[in-house]
Amino acid sequence: MLRIAIAKGRLMDSLINYLDVIEYTTLSETLKNRERQLLLSVDNIECILVKGSDVPIYVEQGMADIGIVGSDILDERQYNVNNLLNMPFGACHFAVAAKPETTNYRKIATSYVHTAETYFKSKGIDVELIKLNGSVELAGVVDMVDGIVDIVQTGTTLKANGLVEKQHISDINARLITNKAAYFKKSQLIEQFIRSLEVSIANA
């Protein structure tokens, strides 16, 4: 039995779409029909559905053998896991966004402090970072900050709130991670699951 931690929300929707494409229907249908369940079983696999930022913690602590999580989470801090594979879904990017007329940044709101700090330092720009845990766009709309650093997929949310993308920071994609001990103890099961996803170790 493999236990897999999957990030809820947008990334899981992307995973389900990908599973449909490769016709891994048993797992896809199980995830689609989950209702409010957070623990699902199918095909000798147990899925735990958790907040994205918690996926590497469950894997690190040995509560999950495998995790599927966005690279944005892994970029924010170091985890004691095997950061194994790029996955062919979940593509988006980090960006600086602000009102169209904004040209200078003194104060930035973000949920991704490390990413924002690294970016502005690389540009030689001294900014005050305000950490928020949700609705980051609102901070830009009400002028609490000069701009935001957030994840952009289509730009629809930015546009709906009168913000525009100013700078592309870095690309994001889904990653497959494993618990270090499980990678050896359950290597055959893990490799079998990876093959079922039609990805290769060459994607590391």
From Swiss-Prot:
The answer to keyword Kinase applying to this record is: no
What GO CC annotations are associated with the protein?
A: cytoplasm
Q: Where in the cell is it found?
A: Cytoplasm
State the top-level EC class: transferase
What Pfam families is this protein classified in?
HisG
What is catalysed by this protein? 1-(5-phospho-beta-D-ribosyl)-ATP + diphosphate = 5-phospho-alpha-D-ribose 1-diphosphate + ATP
Q: What is its EC number?
A: 2.4.2.17
Which InterPro entries does this entry report, sorted A to Z?
A: ATP_PRibTrfase_cat (IPR013820), ATP_PRibTrfase_HisG (IPR001348), ATP_PRibTrfase_HisG_short (IPR024893)
| Keyword Cytoplasm (UniProt) | yes
Describe its function. Catalyzes the condensation of ATP and 5-phosphoribose 1-diphosphate to form N'-(5'-phosphoribosyl)-ATP (PR-ATP). Has a crucial role in the pathway because the rate of histidine biosynthesis seems to be controlled primarily by regulation of HisG enzymatic activity.
- Database matches in PANTHER family: ATP PHOSPHORIBOSYLTRANSFERASE, ATP PHOSPHORIBOSYLTRANSFERASE ATP-PRTASE
- Tell me its family: Belongs to the ATP phosphoribosyltransferase family. Short subfamily.
- What name has this protein been given in UniProt? ATP phosphoribosyltransferase
Which gene holds the coding sequence for this protein?
Answer: hisG
